[in-house]
Structure formats: C-alpha cells, structure tokens
Amino acid sequence: MSFPPHLNRPPMGIPALPPGIPPPQFPGFPPPVPPGTPMIPVPMSIMAPAPTVLVPTVSMVGKHLGARKDHPGLKLKENDENCGPTTTVFVGNISEKASDMLIRQLLAKCGLVLSWKRVQGASGKLQAFGFCEYKEPESTLRALRLLHDLQIGEKKLLVKVDAKTKAQLDEWKAKKKANGNARPETVTNDDEEALDEETKRRDQMIKGAIEVLIREYSSELNAPSQESDSHPRKKKKEKKEDIFRRFPVAPLIPYPLITKEDINAIEMEEDKRDLISREISKFRDTHKKLEEEKGKKEKERQEIEKERRERERERERERERREREREREREREREKEKERERERERDRDRDRTKERDRDRERDRDRDRERSSDRNKDRSRSREKSRDREREREREREREREREREREREREREREREREREKDKKRDREEDEEDAYERRKLERKLREKEAAYQERLKNWEIRERKKTREYEKEAEREEERRREMAKEAKRLKEFLEDYDDDRDDPKYYRGSALQKRLRDREKEMEADERDRKREKEELEEIRQRLLAEGHPDPDAELQRMEQEAERRRQPQIKQEPESEEEEEEKQEKEEKREEPVEEEEEPEQKPCLKPTLRPISSAPSVSSASGNATPNTPGDESPCGIIIPHENSPDQQQPEEHRPKIGLSLKLGASNSPGQPNSVKRKKLPVDSVFNKFEDEDSDDVPRKRKLVPLDYGEDDKNATKGTVNTEEKRKHIKSLIEKIPTAKPELFAYPLDWSIVDSILMERRIRPWINKKIIEYIGEEEATLVDFVCSKVMAHSSPQSILDDVAMVLDEEAEVFIVKMWRLLIYETEAKKIGLVK
C-alpha cells in the first residue's frame, strides 16, 4: 500500500518549528527514539510539520532457525517462506537535488523492487514522494532500517508503511516465528546470536554500498541546482551496482511492527484514536482509487501495445510470406540448376561410355593388328599417343567446363545476394510508403476537422444572424400590434363621435353630376373674385397712367388690348411650309416650353394651359375637367384681360411681347379665332416634356397623373370607365385574397385547378418567388432545392408531401414557406380563371 499525497504535506494552521528544536509531545506518546527504529505514521491532525512524530514498535523476539547448512531440505522450505506477500513502502521527503535514478538504486540495494511509482506535478516535475513495491517483506524491513532518516542532500529520507502493510508484515513474522518454534529444542542462543550477527553483517555491507552510492552522487547533491544524469555516469553507476549485486544476500530476521491492537493499547484520547482510524481508512480508499485508475491506464496502454504488436506481427508475417515466396523461387531455381547439372552429368556419362566403347574397339583393333606386321606397330603406337593426347585434351576441356560451372555458380550466388538487397530495399520503401500514407491520412483528418470547424463557424454566424432577424421581426410585429391597437382605439372614438348628417359629405362622394355642380359653383365664385381683381387691376393701371400724366388712359388701355389680341392672332402664311420646317419649329417650341415645366415643383400635378373663353358665354356642366380643381381661379375678365397664375406656361413669354410699362398682365381678345390651333400645337410639346421625365423619375418618385384632354367627349367617358375598371379590378383582387384560407388544414384541402398550372406560370411567377424565399431562409442561392420544389409542384404533389420533404432542409421555416407558396398557387390559378391576369 502507499500513502496519499495529502499526507506528505504539513497540516494547515500549525507553524513549522525551527531546526534543532524537538517536536512537542502529545499525551499517550513516548518521546522520540533514535533513527533506525521501525515507526508507524501519526495521523495528519496531530502531526507537526517538523520531523514526523513516530511511535516505537514493540520488540518481538523469535527463536533462532538453526544452522541452514546442516538442513538442505529446510533451506528450500525457508526460501519459500521468505517469499511472502508483496509490500509497498512510502518514501517521502525526497530532496530536489536527488535524481530519480539515485532513489531507485537506493531502494534496489535493500531488495528486489517490483515497481517504483513517483507522481509528476502539473509542470512535469517529480514530486518529493513515491511508492516502492518490494517482492519480499524482508526487503521492506531492511528498507525501514537502513533508508529511514538517511541524509540525502539537505533532507532526511522518510520511509514508512501503512497499517495494512504492517498487518501483512506481522502475519509474515508470525509464520516465521511459528516455523522457529517448531524446530528442535537443541537450538542454542549462540546460534541465534550468530544469525543476528549475520544480519548485521549484511546490513553493514548494504549500508557501505549505500554510502558509496551517495558519495558517487555527492556532486549532484551538493550542486546548487538539480542536473540530469549524463550517459557515462549512468554506465559507471550500473557497473558499481553490478559489483554490489555479486555479494551474497544473507537472510533477514523478521522485525515486527506495531499492529492496530497496539495502537488501541496506547493511552490516548478516544477522539484521537478515532481520527487515526479514519485517516487510515481514508488512506486505504484513496490508494485503492489510485490503484484502480493506474490499472485502467495500464490496461489501455496494454491494449495500445497489443494493437501495435499485432500490426508488427502482421507486417512480420507479410515479410515472412514474401521471404518464403522468394525462398520457393530460389528453391525452384536450384532444382532447375540441379536438373541441368544431372543432364550434363548424363551427357558426360554417355561420352565416357562412348569413349570406353571406342577404347575397347581400339583395343580389339589393336589386338587384331598386333598379329599383323611390325611395321604397323609404329603407326599404332603413334595412334595411341595421339589418343592419349586427345584424352588429355578432353580432360582439360572437362576441367575448363567445371571451372565455368563454378563461375556460373558464383554468379548465381551474387545474383541471389542482389535479390536479397532488392528485397530489403523494397521493404524499406514499403515502410516509407506506409508512413507516407499514415501522414497523408492524418493530414486529411486535420483538413476535415478544419473544414468542419469552418462550417460550424458559418452555421453559428448564420444562426446568430437569424436570431437577430427574428428578434427584429418580433419587435416590428409588436410595433404593428401596438399601432393596430392605437388605430382601433382611434377608430372606435371616431365612430362613437360620427354624425351621418354632418360628416357624410366630408367622407363620402356623390355622383359625378353633383360633384361637377359643386365644382361649377366654386368656379363661378372664383370667376367673380377674378373679375373683381381684374377691375381693381385696371383701375390701378388707369391711376398709374394718370399719375404719369398720360392724356388718354382709356385709349392707351384699348391700344394695349388690341396689341395683345394681334399677337394672339396667327400669321398669314405665304406658302406652305415643308415637313422639315414644321418639325424644326415644333422642336423650338418644345425647347422654349421645357424650362417652364422644369421650374414646376415635383409635387405639383401637370396641367395644360387654360383655354381662353369669353366670360359672357356660360360653360356647360361637363366643362369642368378632371384636372380642374375648386381652388383654380378663372383666367378670364370681362374686358378680355387674362391674369396669368404661377402655373400658367405663358409666364415665359419674351420681354418684347410684354407691355412696356412693366406690368405682368397679358392682354388679349376673348374670342381669338387662332386659339384652337395654338392649343393643338402645344399639346404635343407638353406631352413630350412629361414623357421625357417619366422614365427618369419612375423609380424615385410616384408616377404623374395622366393628363386629361380639354376636348371632353368619348375620351372622358373612356377615362372614367378605365378608372372604374381599375377600382373594380382592385376590389376583385382583394375579395379573391380574402377568400383564400389562411389556416393550414383548410388551405391544403382547397381544390386547386392543376390544368392552369403550366410551365409559363411556373417560370414567370412561382419559380422566382421560390428562389427569393430560399435565399431569404438559407442565406444563399440553392438551385437544386428550387428545382426540386418546382418539380414537385409540376408533378401535382400534395402540399403535405412537399412539406415533409422540405422540412429536412428548412426545419421550422418549412411550414411557413409551403403555406405561403400554396396561397400563391391558389391566387394565381383563381386570378387566371376569372381573367385578372393574362
């Protein structure tokens, strides 16, 4: 077992004692004992931050085990008994200057270490404590004796065990003691003392090795900062460690520690005893959790290692398979080579057989010839020598053939060597290719992750934008509701105070005749006012002429009136003008009248120059044109003097056509015969002026009202009929829209005339609307989705099926979108049926 990290820190609230001052004593605890005495930890709540207050253990003396050399069978049994349970030792107060390798070697001097665990902090720095697991309890006892309070650098090492480990050590020592009691009574105290001497001798030997190890690390321990161990120094330490390992290890007598019963036997307060028990239980639980977490991490590491080994084995099997294939290929090559060798050997055998046959034949020939002449002996001897020479030549040829064969064999061996090199190179290339593929896959994964993060970011931006839009829409809707409530309140008050007799003439119109009669009355009143004003002006002119000393003011006024009438009369043409001259003249008049129209304000409605009519002739009721307003005064006077207004285009007359006296009055006869021609001549320039600015101002200002011609007749009737038709059409459209249901069930159940839904209607009305709504909902154009919705509509699909398909893309906006689209479809089909649209 191991101690949790929180037991390695000083308790909060208790100040540290100065060096050299012993810690305070608590009731029920004896004073501190010399170093080397086995100790147990005191709980944190009663422990000072100075050297830890420890309780001395109760010595338990067991009987000696006898001479081991006289009982070899007993020696094996003793070795089995020494291998007790694994025990964990808490090592604390480790100096920062002491390297982890030094602590490992110190722990290894005391016995076989199964594991050494030292916690790393958040910064990666090793903590000042750790947990060492020994294979045998004997090693644990030796570590407690030799390493506790060992001076390392500026600190003393702290070595402890917990209560559970103490219980295991007590059990192990009890077994050892029982084995000692079961031995014969012939065992003497001298043997036990010799065994104690052996243990002390071994402890002294290990202690000397520890001192040598500390002297070896003295440069690091005395250095101002911790330095990492160099590679040569590690080799030197390992050599010295091997030297000390070669010494024989003597068995260690069990040294019992204090048990839980001993703690209960100590005189102390009840709450402190309970606190100690709780601290021990908490320590066990914490260590158990740490062990479970470490076990999980170890399992994960083993799984990863297992997968890595599986991949290595798979790669190794692949290499072995390729090697076996190459080996089989080489084996086939060797078999072929052996077959060729056997074939050559058979050829040689055949050659030798033929040679022997020839030799025998020659021998027979020689035998036959031997009985012939001696003269032939020489020839035979020469033949024989030639045969021997040929035989030697054949032998040399065979030797050369064998040499060539050996050369070919060496060449094949070199070829096999090159093949092996190629295989190794191919393996390296495959490994590099695997590494490249792995890096490529990792890069793709990173790119996918980056793309996902980018899409996520865009989606979040769009969602935030939509949220803001929804909030603004909610605010606008709330504002509209407030306005409607305010308007309803105003209308309620208005209707409560409404009086039909008093307010109907103000808010309702009668027939056209009544309207024109009222306009005529107003016009007559305006004419009367104009006559009065003209008389006043004439009187003013006469007074001015008298003030200037004119002899005959009346004659002067008459002369001015005649001059104005003469200017109004058309000139007599000597010869007809050509069409080009007429066009030039018309363009000049247009240019002359354009500044007049440009000076008018945009809000003023265009009107034609009023026609000069004699006051004596009473106009008909229908003479009030649509352009005439009740506020427009008449321009005639009894004497024929016309007073121009600010809307009159005759204000732009040249200076020479005005009276010399400087008055802004225009004189003229009331019954001028050339007046209709002048009106006809000026109709076209005025229309052209308005047509010129109509296109430019159509986007910025409202369209100007169409001018009504002065010649009232069929045109007036048609205009009135057109106005009525427009009003009726607007009423039809409004009633049609009101008839279309707004609730989804009634809207989807509305019968739709699919025969009217054609490609022309789809392209002109439905598709642009769908595209605009998709851009509004998604934020970008989505041609595929638009085509899909249009195809579903052209396929006469039900609105619910289209809603189900579109809901996967538009989510909660899908229902609103389909409801609006279906209302548009119903409106277009119904409007086309009744002729509202073409």
Swiss-Prot record:
There is a cross-link at residues 260, 272, 425, 573, 666, 683, 692, 717 (Glycyl lysine isopeptide (Lys-Gly) (interchain with G-Cter in SUMO2)). Residues 745-838 form the PWI domain. One of its GO terms (biological process) is regulation of apoptotic process. Residues 1-30, 173-201, 220-242, 282-437, 493-683 are annotated as: Disordered. Residues 87-164 form the RRM domain. It comes from the Eukaryota. Residues 284-639 are annotated as: Necessary for nuclear speckle localization. The modification Phosphoserine is found at residues 225, 228, 578, 672, 678, 698. It is found in: Nucleus speckle; Cytoplasm. One of its GO terms (cellular component) is cytoplasm. Keywords: Acetylation, Apoptosis, Cytoplasm, Isopeptide bond, mRNA processing, mRNA splicing, Nucleus, Phosphoprotein, RNA-binding, Ubl conjugation. Its main location: nucleus. Residues 282-428, 516-568, 585-594 have a biased composition (Basic and acidic residues). Sumoylated. The modification N6-acetyllysine is found at residue 135. One of its GO terms (molecular function) is mRNA binding. Residues 669-678 have a biased composition (Polar residues). Residues 616-625 have a biased composition (Low complexity). The PWI domain binds nucleic acids with significant help from its N-terminal flanking basic region. It has an equal preference for binding to single- or double-stranded species, and it contributes to RBM25 role in modulation of alternative splicing, maybe by mediating RNA-dependent association with LUC7L3. Interacts with LUC7L3 and SRRM1. Specifically associates with functional splicing complexes, including Sm proteins and U1, U2, U4, U5 and U6 snRNAs. Associates with exon junction complex (EJC) proteins, including APEX1, DDX39B, NCBP1, RBM8A and RNPS1. Interaction with NCBP1 is RNA-dependent. RNA-binding protein that acts as a regulator of alternative pre-mRNA splicing. Involved in apoptotic cell death through the regulation of the apoptotic factor BCL2L1 isoform expression. Modulates the ratio of proapoptotic BCL2L1 isoform S to antiapoptotic BCL2L1 isoform L mRNA expression. When overexpressed, stimulates proapoptotic BCL2L1 isoform S 5'-splice site (5'-ss) selection, whereas its depletion caused the accumulation of antiapoptotic BCL2L1 isoform L. Promotes BCL2L1 isoform S 5'-ss usage through the 5'-CGGGCA-3' RNA sequence. This is RNA-binding protein 25.
